[in-house]
């Protein structure tokens, strides 16, 4: 179970469904590498607890992405999805991904340093090219700081 998992009564959950081309490879990446607990599945889809949110991976052709999103000095893949973690959990996940040999689109780094909304970020793709961003904040109160 993810370290950020909370009881279902505490908040609403986000659901995202997207395509992958191999459910076994998806189980290895989302389950073994990211540490997401598997939920229901059939022979054409599988659900995961993605850090207390539901993702549904369906067999099909993944969306095409391109580095068209400008954030600071970087072009990031669009579209992408991701999550926000507290900084200690973010650092632990970054170390886990590095130990697993995940190739980063944008390696773990700080952005907006010293500014409101200072955050740590990393971008990587699942084995099917679906881009994922994970942000880390010292305090979740800073997520919408401007």
Residue ranges and their predicted role:
Residues 1-9, 12-20, 49, 69-146:
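Vicinal oxygen chelate
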Residues 22, 52, 59-61, 85-87, ...:
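Non-catalytic surface loops within mature trypsin-like serine protease
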Residues 56-57, 63-67, 140-143:
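A short local loop/turn or secondary-structure capping micro-motif enriched for an aromatic residue
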């Amino acid at each position: 179970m993810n370290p950020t998992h909370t009881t279902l009564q505490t908040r609403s959950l986000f659901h995202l469904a997207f395509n992958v081309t191999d459910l076994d490879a998806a189980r290895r990446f989302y389950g073994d590498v990211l540490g997401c607990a598997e939920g229901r599945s059939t022979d054409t889809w599988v659900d995961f607890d993605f850090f207390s949110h539901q993702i549904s991976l369906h067999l099909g052709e993944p969306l095409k992405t391109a580095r068209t999103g400008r954030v600071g000095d970087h072009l990031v893949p669009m579209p992408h999805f991701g999550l926000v973690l507290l900084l200690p959990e973010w650092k632990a996940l970054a170390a886990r991904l590095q130990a697993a040999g995940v190739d980063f689109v944008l390696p773990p780094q700080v952005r907006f340093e010293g500014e409101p909304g200072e955050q740590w970020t990393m971008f990587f793709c699942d084995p099917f090219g679906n881009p994922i961003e994970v942000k880390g904040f010292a305090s979740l109160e800073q997520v919408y700081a401007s």
